Amino acid sequence: MTVIQHLIKELKMIAHPEGGHFSESFRDENNNVSLIYYMLQKDERSHWHRLTKNEILHFYKGDPITIYISKDDVDFTSVILGENNNFHLVVE
């Protein structure tokens, strides 16, 4: 069993509609906060999506990943997670 297969099994991950795999580990009773594990494998992409709440990303393992952020659907910035001790990102 590969590390990826092990993580998918142990964390009970399922395919995410925007790409990759995920499992929810917490959701508060008011649906204001949720925590998920999210994993992209090599050559997988996460599709652009609009946020309705702040999103906090944590990087645990693997190759660095570039996160693209656009507040106006025209210009964007990018942040590389997992590089130069950059292991979390808050997107508002």
What is each model feature region?
Residues M1-L89:
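Non-catalytic, conserved peripheral segments adjacent to functional cores
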